[in-house]
UniProtKB/Swiss-Prot annotation:
Protein's GO biological process: ribosome disassembly
InterPro entries membership: T_IF-3_C_sf (IPR036788), T_IF-3_N_sf (IPR036787), Translation_initiation_fac3_CS (IPR019813), Translation_initiation_fac_3 (IPR001288), Translation_initiation_fac_3_C (IPR019815), Translation_initiation_fac_3_N (IPR019814)
GO molecular function, one term: ribosome binding
Keyword Protein biosynthesis applies: yes
SUPFAM superfamilies with a match to the protein in the record: Translation initiation factor IF3, C-terminal domain (SSF55200), Translation initiation factor IF3, N-terminal domain (SSF54364)
Protein name: Translation initiation factor IF-3
Functional description taken from the UniProt entry: IF-3 binds to the 30S ribosomal subunit and shifts the equilibrium between 70S ribosomes and their 50S and 30S subunits in favor of the free subunits, thus enhancing the availability of 30S subunits on which protein synthesis initiation begins.
Gene designation per UniProt: infC
UniProt record similarity statement: Belongs to the IF-3 family.
Native species: Bacteroides thetaiotaomicron (strain ATCC 29148 / DSM 2079 / JCM 5827 / CCUG 10774 / NCTC 10582 / VPI-5482 / E50)
Keyword Ubl conjugation belongs to the record: no
Amino acid sequence: MKNDTLKGQYRINEQIRAKEVRIVGDEIEPKVYPIFQALKMAEEKELDLVEISPNAQPPVCRIIDYSKFLYQLKKRQKEQKAKQVKVNVKEIRFGPQTDDHDYNFKLKHARGFLEDGDKVKAYVFFKGRSILFKEQGEVLLLRFANDLEDFAKVDQMPVLEGKRMTIQLSPKKRKCLKNRRLPNR
């Protein structure tokens, strides 16, 4: 299916409508040729005349094996896609009354996520009347951000969204982060 979209992208051989074309390539002197001469040259070499740049005046063409050209394009696109950095957002949930042991456990996991290059979204979930303790939730999230300041920078300060108060952290550039230790509280 993707190959079909690449096929329709370039005009080849008789599909080229211009009267003259500029041919570029390895074994051909780059200059302007009439279309019939360019097609004849491609036919003699048992290759295709492919219109690379249709908007140029005159259009730029190459004499190449079209299927090989499509294969190389597809391969290049696949390599570019593999080089893209995929950012994951990991969520960590707290309650407004989170105990120190639970806090340290979640802090340790957040540190691991940040070292792996993932973003961390920490939130305090308020159930029922616990929304009255939103100041405690904000203090907890600010403490969380402060404890991770060596590993992360704050993208978004604590914000109350419905029954959740969230903070978003993204990893700092890596420079010997693995040797640092978490503060004990």
